[in-house]
A protein has these predicted regions:
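OB-fold and OB-like single-stranded nucleic-acid-recognition modules
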Residues: 1-206
Length: 206
């Protein structure tokens, strides 16, 4: 990917309110901290559900009743890492939880990220004629790391995004969605799930 420069204080904020699908499972240990993985189901206005992967420090999952599919509020940020195992998708997208609390109210799925376009946008039309632009946004975090977040833009926002060359800084607001697709592999078709930010608004910052 082309070298890009980002704003000094990029934003990466996620707010999810949904139903826990299953009890947390141990993921890994890093620098003496143990992390759990859990799945949150968040309903859209259309009635469709997004099943989103959450990574959380075990201190956040302790002391909360996690049985019988409770509703939870998760605040955090989107993280990405490359999967080099050769199994499943290469770019893994999760929500890194900063807080997890009980919730008793309406579902919520809101994302605000700022970063730079790091791959040439792809503009296209759906079979129903809707305009779409796919782009990848690089969002900086501490220690010179970056998260690469796939984004999908619609309509007039898609037209604007299609005109953004690599290095363009954007602020995108929308939701984190899950989408099933079929990947053709040497062993035959394989169903996979993609995670991407579906943009409601996108604003150029430079």
């Amino acid at each position: 990917m082309e070298e890009i420069r980002l704003q000094p204080e990029p934003m990466n904020q996620v707010l999810l309110r949904g139903v826990l699908l299953k009890a947390p499972e141990f993921s890994h240990e890093n620098h003496g901290k143990r992390f759990d993985r859990l799945t949150l189901s968040v309903q859209r206005l259309s009635g469709t559900y997004d099943h989103l992967e959450i990574l959380a420090d075990q201190t956040l999952t302790q002391g909360i009743c996690l049985l019988d599919g409770p509703m939870l509020e998760v605040r955090g940020e989107i993280r990405s890492f490359n999967n080099h195992s050769g199994q499943g998708r290469r770019l893994v997208i999760t929500v890194y939880a900063r807080s997890i609390t009980p919730w008793n109210g309406a579902p919520e799925n809101s994302v605000t990220i700022t970063g730079a376009v790091c791959r040439e946008p792809v503009y296209r039309h759906t079979p129903l004629g809707r305009e779409i632009t796919d782009l990848m946004l690089a969002v900086s975090r501490k220690y010179r790391r970056r998260d690469y977040i796939p984004c999908i833009l619609w309509g007039s926002v898609a037209r604007m995004g299609a005109q953004c060359p690599v290095g363009t800084e954007l602020c995108i607001q929308g939701r984190l969605q899950s989408r099933s697709y079929v990947k053709q592999t040497p062993d035959g078709p394989e169903e996979r799930i993609a995670y991407e930010v579906s943009a409601i608004t996108a604003q150029r910052l430079n």
